[in-house]
Amino acid sequence: VLLYLPGVVGIWFFVYLCNAWAFQILVNTSDHDKHLSFAHAFKLTVSGFAFSYTTPFGSGGAPYRVMELSRYIGTPRAVSSVALYSMMHVFSHFFLWTTALLAFVIAHFDVMTAWLWTLFAIFLTVFVAAAVFFSYSYKHGIIARLFRLLFFVPLLRRPARRFYERHATAFDTIDANIRFLYEHPRQLWGSLAAEYLGRLLNSFEFYFILLA
C-alpha cells in the first residue's frame, strides 16, 4: 500500500497545475488590462478546492475565488471568470466519461450486448445535450437567465427580483464577459484541454488505489 501512496497523493500536484492553467487562461481572456500570473492562479486553485472540500456541498470554493479575484479585476469580471471555470470543470468531466466509454467499447467490442449499446447511446445523447447547453451558455451568457429562475420560486421571487433590478448592469457585464470568451475559441478550447488533461491525470489516483 505504501508503495503507491506517493502516487495517490503526488498526482494531485499535477492535477492542480492543469486546473490552474485552465483558470489562468479564462481569467486572462477578457477585456481587462490585468494579467493573472500562473503562481497566483495556482494559489487560488489549490485554496479554492480546499474550501470546496471542507464546506457543505462544496459551496465555499467559488465564493472564495470571486472574493480574492475581485480585488484584482473587479467583481463582475471575477464572477464571470469563476462561473466560466466552474462550467469548464464540469464540461471536462463529460469528455473524460466519453473517453472512458469509447475505450471500453474498443477494448471489449466483442462482448458488447444490446443492453450495453443502449446505455452507450443514452450517454451519448446526454453528452450531446450537455455540449449544446454549454455552447449556448458560452455564446449567449447564462448567469442572468439562471438567476431569473428565482423569480418563479415562492418566497424568493420578490427579493430576487429586487436584487436583479438593482444589479442589472452587473449581470449584463458578467454575461458579456462570458460571451467574450466564446469569441476567442483558441482560449476556450485551450482551457478545456487543460481541464481535460487534469481529469485524465486525476484518474490515475484511482488506478494507484486499485493497484494498492
Task: Mark where each language-model region is.
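Predominantly cytoplasmic-facing regulatory/coupling regions of multi-pass membrane proteins
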Residues: 1-46, 113-212
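Transmembrane helix-loop-helix hairpins in multi-pass inner-membrane proteins
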Residues: 1, 48-158
